[in-house]
């Protein structure tokens, strides 16, 4: 009987460890050199190391290419770069169904606790999450004019928030 219990415990813990993991790309420290990230993550655009200026560039990836989390399978990951350094990242998803909450579920289980009001179907807005260190984390949920749900999760540092939301951000191809 003890062997049977041990067997089920081992199987249970193995499956939990296998299925619950955070997107490790989101753990990359803000300010990390993009050349280091290119060595670590397949699929990132190779940046020209001689192209250093103060322009903020936005690169758009399918989140599932850099994150294996099930909640992010239909999301996009926007990577913000200035002077060849990572200054922020944002997960975005547009749902046809107002009841979906993939980014909310991902955030709640992998990033931090959200305000209780964010769980409500009819709540729309932005919440700043408590974070360790210099990280500035925002979760946002909005209803579009055509009744779709737009969820975002921004991870950056407070020094870069204005740069990321600046109209001068250039979308890189």
Model-assigned labels for residue ranges:
Residues 17-19:
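N-terminal signal peptide c-region/cleavage motif recognized by signal peptidases
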Residues 12-15:
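Repetitive helical segments and hydrophobic/amphipathic motifs
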Residues 21-60, 83, 88-173:
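Non-cytosolic coordination micro-motifs
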Residues 2-10:
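Sec-dependent signal peptide recognition
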Residues 70-74:
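Alpha-helical scaffolding within the catalytic cores
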Residues 75-80:
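Hydrophobic/aromatic beta-strand elements that line small-molecule binding cavities or substrate pockets
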